Amino acid sequence: MNGISLSDGEWKLMNALWQNAPCTLSQLVGLLENDTGWTKSTIFVMLKRLSSKGAVEINCEGKLQLYSPLILREDATIKETESFLSRVYGGSIGLMISSMAGQKALSEKDIADLRKILEDAGKENSDD
């Protein structure tokens, strides 16, 4: 996995690309301007920055420039989760879950899903 970190705005732009790529600049403006208020020039600058980070590729087809993600959503999500976990909880998954459970942020379905995840993780660890 790569080490590309995304800002909140870059996440919005990348989500649009992950769902719709390849896209022209005009298509991205249409997808993002109502929710963000971003102008064409703002989105263009963000695309250039994401390209220089290695997150977006720019392909020219005639006069059109098409933008596509170079990183997978799953990889970016893992990187963001690791960063958040380290920054906020000192890397402790247990502390994070305890905090969420203490705030009653977990539904019964969440708890059942966590049990299944932990059971599966326990099985994988015992196989090693």
What are these regions (language model features)?
Residues 3-9, 61-80:
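Short, cationic-aromatic polyanion-contact patches
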Residues 30-38:
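Short helix-coil junctions and helix-kink-helix linkers
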Residues 11-15, 27, 95:
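Pre-recognition alpha-helix immediately N-terminal to the DNA-recognition helix
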Residues 71-97:
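Conserved segment of winged-helix/HTH DNA-binding domains
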Residues 47-48:
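Short, hydrophobic-biased segments on the C-terminal half of alpha helices
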Residues 23-31:
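Short acidic, hydrophobic short linear motifs in intrinsically disordered regions
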Residues 54:
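Glycine-centered, phosphate/nucleic-acid-interacting loop/turn motifs that mediate DNA/RNA or nucleotide
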Residues 79, 102-128:
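C-terminal regulatory/oligomerization modules of transcriptional regulators
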